[in-house]
Amino acid sequence: MGGCMSREASEEMEQRKKSQAIDREIMDDSRRLRRECKILLLGSGESGKSTIVKQMKIIHQNGYTVDELQHYRLTVYKNLVDCAKALIDAMRQFDIVPEHEANKEHMEFLYTFQVDPDPNVPLDLHVSKAVAALWDDPAVPSVLEHQSEFYIMDSAPYFFAEAARIGSPEYIPSEADVLRARTKTTGIYETRFTMGQLNIHMFDVGGQRSERKKWIHCFESVTSIIFCVALSEYDQVLLEEQNQNRMLESLVLFDSVVNSRWFVRTSIILFLNKVDLFRQKLPRTPLSNYFPDYSGGPDVNRAAKYLLWRFNQVNRAHLNLYPHLTQATDTSNIRLVFAAVKETILQNALKDSGIL
C-alpha cells in the first residue's frame, strides 16, 4: 500500500512539473508577443515624420495638455510669419503686384516683422490682419501657379486661413494647429507608447541632408521602418538645394535605406503621405510633366500606384514592403492606418519568434 501511495505522489509531482512547464511556456510566449518593437521613422525633410509622432501622442498618449499646447504658440507664430514672407518673396520673384493698394504696405510691414521670442507675448494684431488681407488679394492665385518654383510650407494655406484666430491675444494652439506646426527636426527623438500587445519605441530622425549621418546610431535591432514620402512633392524642390526635385531625392534616399545591409531582416512600411494635397495638385500640375513615362492622367489612385511602382523598382533587396496612403494631419486616417501597421508588426514578430 505504501508503494501505491508513493507511486501516486510521484505521478502527481510529475503532473505538477508538466503543468508548471506549460505555464512557463505560456508566459514565455506572452512575453514574446508583448515584445519591444523599435520603429525607425525615415524620409526626407517635410515628408510628415514628426506629424506621425504627434499623432501617436494624440492617439496613444492621451493627447496634449493645455500647457503642452501653449508650448507650440511661438512655433505657430513663426510659421505664420515665415509663410507670409515666403509668399511675399514669390510675389517679388515673379513680379506680381497686389491689386489692393493697402496690401503693398502690408507686404512691407510683414517682410520686416520679427516674432517676439517670448512665447507669452501675443502676436501683434496688425500681423494677423495684414496676413488675412494679403491672402485674400486677387493677385495671390497667380503666385500659387508658380508653386513648384519656390519654397513655401504645405501648411501655409491653413495658417493664412486661421490668421485671425492665431492673432487673438488669448490664442491657445489647437491639436490641429500642432499637427501642422513645423520645426526642423535635428537629432533623434524617441517616443514610447503601447499599441495592443506591442511596446513601441519610435525614433523620429532629422530628414534634412545634414541630419542623415546620425541615423546610423538607430540601426541596430530595428523591428520595422516607416518610410514617409510626401506624394505632393513630385513638383517641388528641396529646401537645401533648389534645383533638386524632392520626389527624386526621396527615391534616392529610399534606395539607400531599403538596400542597406543594416535592414536585411526589416519590414519596410511605406507611407505615401499628403494624399490630400496630392489629389488637389494633380489636375493643375500633371505628374507626367516630371515623370514622362506616367500616362494615368489626374486619377489619384493611378498616380499613387505609379509612384509606388517607382519605389518598388529600387527595392533590389526584395524586402517586404507594406504601402499605405496617408494624410498625417488627419487623426482618424492615421488611427486606421496604424491598426493595420500593428497587425503587420505583430505578424512579423510572431514569425521571428517561431510561433508562426
From Swiss-Prot:
Task: Name what cofactor the protein needs.
Answer: Mg(2+)
Return the SUPFAM superfamilies for the record.
Answer: P-loop containing nucleoside triphosphate hydrolases (SSF52540), Transducin (alpha subunit), insertion domain (SSF47895)
Using the UniProt annotation, give all residue ranges assigned to the region (G5 motif).
326-331
Question: Keyword GTP-binding on this protein?
Answer: yes
Q: Which UniProt keywords apply?
A: GTP-binding, Lipoprotein, Magnesium, Metal-binding, Myristate, Nucleotide-binding, Palmitate, Transducer
The effect of disrupting this gene, in the record's words, is: Decreases trap formation following exposure to C.elegans; formed traps exhibit abnormal morphology with a single or half loop.
A molecular function (GO) held by this record is:
GTPase activity
Where does this protein hold Mg(2+)? 50, 185
Lipid attachment (S-palmitoyl cysteine) is at 4
Q: Where are the transmembrane segments?
A: none
Q: Among its keywords, does the record have Metal-binding?
A: yes
Sorted alphabetically, the Gene Ontology BP terms of this entry are:
adenylate cyclase-activating G protein-coupled receptor signaling pathway
- Could you tell me what this protein does? Alpha subunit of the heterotrimeric guanine nucleotide-binding protein (G protein) involved in adenylate cyclase-activating ascaroside pheromone-activated G protein-coupled receptor signaling pathway. Binding of prey ascaroside pheromones to transmembrane receptors GPR2 and GPR3 leads to activation of the pathway and positive regulation of trap formation for nematode capture.
Q: What is this protein called?
A: Guanine nucleotide-binding protein alpha-2 subunit
* Name of the gene encoding the protein in the UniProt record: GPA2
